[in-house]
Amino acid sequence: MIRQAIAKVVELRDLSEGEMIEVMNQIMSGECTPAQIGSFITALRMKGETIAEISGAARVMRERATPIRVGRNVLDIDRDDINLDQETILDVVGTGGDGTNTFNISTTVSFIVSACGVKVAKHGNRSVSSACGSADVLEKLGVNLDVTPEQVERCINEIGIGFLFAPALHGAMKHAIGPRREIGIRTIFNILGPLTNPANADCQVMGVYREELVAKMAGVLHHLGCKRGFVVHGRDGMDEITLTGETAAAEVSPEGVRLFTITPEEFGFSRCSMQALKGGDAVANAAIVRAVLGGEPGPRREIVLLNAGFALLAAGRCATVAAGIDLAAQAIDSGAALMQIEKLATLTN
């Protein structure tokens, strides 16, 4: 099948979702040669991946991932402003590859959101776009990445947050590692990570490295049945909601996709320079995460609050972004968010 798929894609013809599923199953079963894999993902990149193609690939990766089973039968009753719903699982994740070298914003947000009563399955890896990926900073915060799926499940169920280390849970990806490394360009695999959470997170805030991906990835999330989510791209290049200017965004719901723009001012924040959000290596970024969760004021706190507000809205923990920002601030100022780091470190060691 992959030879026929390559022949079709080099003629700039799209694959159906079913065809993509067939090809991805071949790749992840080890049935394709490195040359075939490299040719296929390069041709797909040159043509441009469609929603159907990305969705098909994501379905296969989800099916082949080691599952993380999280209890969803608990009702969150600490809400009086929205309807009660079955407990949701949230992921706050970026594609990486934005090249901005900011501190670990989505990881910091994950601790805050979990302190607000939302179960967070943080899916991540080592560095892509900076000197420090989510896995790198978590190690320096004392979190053990070498844990079993059962330990990850226990973390999420008991303290509300667990880290899903992608290489440990996507074993079938090993067949694509060599071709990806050797061709050295961004391919469909660079955008599949945020779509393939092994805990089947049904709510999500996803950052992407190019604005053209906002609507496309939102379309994929909608197609894959995301309960509620936001796809964002800071127009300064960040794969987060930025404080330096505007953010292109899409809201995903069962009804469809809504495109809109976010500005810091609409939520009471001042714009800042990119320099104010810069990070460093894993040791430096771990210190920044602790400082922000310890109550340090300034742009780092504000960008984390803004992103957390949208994450809490996606998870149904609040009715508005403004209410989510208030909840996030309370989680920091009470010490609850910082305590989540210690709980996760203790439970994984």
UniProtKB/Swiss-Prot annotation:
Binding sites annotated in the UniProt record for 5-phospho-alpha-D-ribose 1-diphosphate: 94, 97-98, 102, 104-107, 122-130, 134
Q: How is the cofactor bound?
A: Binds 2 magnesium ions per monomer.
Gene Ontology cellular component list: cytosol
List the GO biological process terms. L-tryptophan biosynthetic process
The cofactors it requires, by name, are: Mg(2+)
Give the UniProt keywords, A-Z.
Answer: Amino-acid biosynthesis, Aromatic amino acid biosynthesis, Glycosyltransferase, Magnesium, Metal-binding, Transferase, Tryptophan biosynthesis
Question: Which catalysed reactions does the entry list for this protein?
Answer: N-(5-phospho-beta-D-ribosyl)anthranilate + diphosphate = 5-phospho-alpha-D-ribose 1-diphosphate + anthranilate
- Where Mg(2+) 1 is bound, by residue? S106, E240
Keyword field contains Metal-binding: yes
Residues annotated as binding anthranilate 1 are G94, N125
Transmembrane annotation, as ranges: none
Q: So where does Mg(2+) 2 get bound? A: D239, E240
Q: In which pathway does it act?
A: Amino-acid biosynthesis; L-tryptophan biosynthesis; L-tryptophan from chorismate: step 2/5
> Does the record carry Metal-binding as a key word?
yes
Q: Which cysteines does the record link by disulfide bonds?
A: none
Residues that coordinate or bind anthranilate 2: R180
Q: How does it assemble?
A: Homodimer.
What PANTHER family does the annotation carry? ANTHRANILATE PHOSPHORIBOSYLTRANSFERASE (PTHR43285:SF2)
- Entry's family note: Belongs to the anthranilate phosphoribosyltransferase family.
* Protein name, as recorded: Anthranilate phosphoribosyltransferase
What species was this sequence derived from? Trichlorobacter lovleyi (strain ATCC BAA-1151 / DSM 17278 / SZ)
Taxon lineage = Bacteria, Pseudomonadati, Thermodesulfobacteriota, Desulfuromonadia, Geobacterales
In the UniProt record, the gene name given for this protein reads trpD
